[in-house]
Amino acid sequence: MRVVSLVPSLTETLFALGAGDDVVGITDFCMFPENLDRPRVGGTKTPDIAKIRQLRPDIVYINVEENLKKHADAIARFARVIATEPKTIDDVVKLIEMLGRMHHRERRAQELVQQITDNRQQRTSFSFVVPIWKKPWMWCGGDTYVSNLVESVGGRNLLRERTRYPSIGVDEVLALQPDIVFLPDEPYAFTQADAHHLARTLSASAPAESGRVIGPFPGHLFTWHGVRTIAGLKFLLEVDSKI
C-alpha cells in the first residue's frame, strides 16, 4: 500500500505503528519522527496536487480541520481520500485501531491504545481555559479535542458551553478565575511575554487566589492526535501532580 499523509500527527502515528514503509509522501510540517526522508508535497493547506499524483498513492490521509475540501476533491480524482476528525480521546482510540487494521499493524495499535488507557487517569479536579489565538483572542470551546484531552485527567473547561473556538476578550475570560491557563505555542506562537501578561491579568481579576499560567509549551502536545496523545496525557498528569 502506498499512502500520502497530509496530516503531521498521522504521519507520526503511522511510523509509530511500524507502517512507515507504506508512507511515500508527507507535508512540509511533518516533523516527527525526526529526520524523515520521504518526499515533501507542500503544506497542509498548500499541497502540490501534481506531486501527490506523481507519487501514485493508493490512499491519501487528510484532516477535516487541517486540510481544505477543494484539495481533497482534487486528490479524490486519482486516489482514495480518508478524512479524519477526532474530537475526543475515544475518537483517537478508534483512529489508531482503524490505522492498525488498514496497515496490518493491529497488535501495535492495541499497544498504543493501552498506553492511552494507562495514562488516562482523572486526578485532582481543576478549572482551565486554553487560548489558541491572539488578535483577536480565541479559546478552545467544549466540543474540541483540546478540551476533551484536558478533561480526561480531571480538568473542567470554563468555556465548555461554547462551541469550537469562540472569540472572547481576555479580561472577560480571565474574570472567570480559572485555576490554570494553558498556553500552547501553536497554532498561535505565544511567547513568554504573553504568559506574563496573562498572569498579571489573572492576578488582578482574582488577587486573593490567582490561578497559574502554564506555558508556552510545545503545542503539539495538545493539538496533535494519535500517538502524540500519549505524550499529551503524560504532560497533563505531570501538571496535575503539582496542583
Regions found by a protein language model. Give the residues of each.
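N-terminal ligand-binding lobe of clamshell/alpha-beta domains
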Residues: 1-243
